[in-house]
């Protein structure tokens, strides 16, 4: 990673990351948070990687383990972009069907969608699931887009912009005042 000496350096580096990533490349994001890992997410990630390789789709599709999107009771959770198709309780056995149907044929695997118990209405996108629908996801809203082991994912989404502002555009007094106004008190809140 290059040295960042100004906000312009950070923005230039972010643009380089974005340029390397194909916006047309499908992305399979598998929750790799503790809850999903406990229910088999690592095996799901491995199954997707193997299936993508088997089908010769490495240039069209990337597979990422990501942060927790929050709906742990329904994990492992898989989100496929750019369509934002959200599948719940995915197993390695589901992977060939997902790759064939959703990745190759652009069809939805209905049985893996969220289904509202009250009215049996299915939600295709994470944002349409009642658990998420009314949430304002300020802190973990991008978790399903970020591999916690890949700093480029964070930078591509604008990560470190607040730090850059504090370092290069604010005085020490302004930084202290901003922290006081925020109400932050440490790890415990």
Task: Locate each region found by the language model.
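Feature of Fe-S/electron-transfer and energy-metabolism proteins
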Residues: 1-189
